[in-house]
Amino acid sequence: MKKLPIIAFGALIIGFLALCIYSYNQNQQYDQWIASLARSKYIEKDERNGNLGDNYEGSKDAKALIVEYADYQCPGCATTFPYLSEIVEEYKGKVGLIFRSFILSYHKNGTAAAHAANAAALQGYWQAYATILFKNQSEWEDLEAGKRDVKFKSYFEEASKNQGNADQFLSDMNSEAVKKKVKSDMAVAKLVNITETPTIIINGEKLPTISVNESTFKKTVHEMIDAALKKAESGSSNNTK
């Protein structure tokens, strides 16, 4: 009779070790997948990112790709996001903007905002929703969860022009798909050593830290895009991950 507790304890230990090994292998496979991604290019949807590919404006296959790592609660990101949208529009198909979340730990509602934006993306409204989030940042950045989610729902209704499913949006905000998407964005950001927002990379070249003054910012981005396009058109485009 005394052997039964010992056997049960042994089985428990074996089960725990098996779970640890499985978890370790899963983490290893995930890290290998992240490392394999072409980080200066569009990342396709995959089960590991919740079947949500990169959010983007313009052409995801453009010769010049701007990759922005940003936090929806970051004031500097709110300033530069519309500038980048305007630049993408100016180049008409030659430039694309890829957006990845890099959430700063001290931003109270940064994670919730990233979840909301990706929930909107599931219904095809990411660009409109992101624009509204940044434009109205001061309205939601300090709200408690209940009032914040009501506000986020109203933004979704505005972004979708009341054509989207608002209840589905609220459900998707806390879905596994959205959590996986944000996790993968953060993992990619960590891999390329992102430490601040906004961080902007154009065809693998990092934009230097500059003033977010509109004319200075746009001038520098234009110069980098023109150089990237010239390089791409000469057949020596950047293949760096």
Positions of predicted regions on the chain:
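Loop/helix-junction capping segments adjacent to catalytic residues or to phosphate/diphosphate-binding pockets
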Residues: 77, 106-107, 179, 215
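C-terminal cap of thioredoxin/glutaredoxin-like
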Residues: 1-24, 157-241
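Structural alpha/beta surface segment adjacent to cysteine/selenocysteine redox centers
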Residues: 67-72, 78-160, 190-192, 220-223, ...
